[in-house]
Amino acid sequence: MSKNYHIAVLPGDGIGPEVMTQALKVLNAVRNRFAMRITTSHYDVGGAAIDNHGQPLPPATVEGCEQADAVLFGSVGGPKWEHLPPDQQPERGALLPLRKRFKLFSNLRPAKLYQGLEAFCPLRADIAANGFDILCVRELTGGIYFGQPKGREGSGQYEKAFDTEVYHRFEIERIARIAFESARKRRHKVTSIDKANVLQSSILWREIVNEIATEYPDVELAHMYIDNATMQLIKDPSQFDVLLCSNLFGDILSDECAMITGSMGMLPSASLNEQGFGLYEPAGGSAPDIAGKNIANPIAQILSLALLLRYSLDADDAACAIERAINRALEEGIRTGDLARGAAAVSTDEMGDIIARYVAEGV
């Protein structure tokens, strides 16, 4: 008998609800094809929760997430709520507390250039022609964003500001294992990013990554300085499989990886804790300017579902089925407006229907 799974669904604001609808169509196709027992419950979050409950992250939403095996998150935010104090706005008041509550220490951001979308890549045509499929694994809870001491002091010419880059052994060990385990499901290569020629924290990072690598003899390990990595991503992104990054370096490189794909509407992300519980969401924003027009690209949300199946439900076959369905749709020239460039475009609903059908048919 298959295991019972439960997913907390948080559609959010802007295009969130309409792209989430498409992901749930695909989930239904997965359930039927793979005989998976998956239930869902919907909860308000972000601006929708402010409107309905007076706060961006109501207790009922937190409780619903606690009872789930994973969270499928849409997007939050919009001009309607920008007048609120920063900690009460949808982004800071919902997403950051969820990450803290569930101790989500690792962020996974795939960046793939799909066949047929090379023209959207801002790199030279000969580089784009090689394609790329990169997974950026970023540590989320340590490093310079959280290290102490930090602050400002002094005045006049002696005024100064300071931050502290701090990493503990356990933080490096656990994010390194995420990267190596991910590489085992991909092309068996990890490139660890640091600045070990200057920073003590990076020296420790490199030492510990080397130690963890001995547990994965089937995975190739390379080290690269952050400044060189930013250049190599532009020069030849196809050389990379899994990028292992600290919080700061991952923040930079994951956005660079996203940019060279040419479309934020294609980029999912996952944030995981040590127990495998995860929050899965598109990398783009709520796009309130196109909300409700049935023109948003739902692929990032659907790919976020694929990540959920792979990392939290250990259903790699189902995740691969979704990815193959998306590949087929794109190979056939099926595009939403953001990718059409003057050609005929399908609606949000139509793209969801097509991908769900391809999953059901086992393309």
Swiss-Prot record:
PANTHER family: 3-ISOPROPYLMALATE DEHYDROGENASE. One of its GO terms (cellular component) is cytosol. Gene3D superfamilies: Isopropylmalate Dehydrogenase. Binds 1 Mg(2+) or Mn(2+) ion per subunit. The record marks 145, 195 as: Important for catalysis. Its EC number is 1.1.1.85. Its cofactor is Mg(2+); Mn(2+). Its main location: cytoplasm. This is 3-isopropylmalate dehydrogenase. It is found in: Cytoplasm. Belongs to the isocitrate and isopropylmalate dehydrogenases family. LeuB type 1 subfamily. Catalyzes the oxidation of 3-carboxy-2-hydroxy-4-methylpentanoate (3-isopropylmalate) to 3-carboxy-4-methyl-2-oxopentanoate. The product decarboxylates to 4-methyl-2 oxopentanoate.
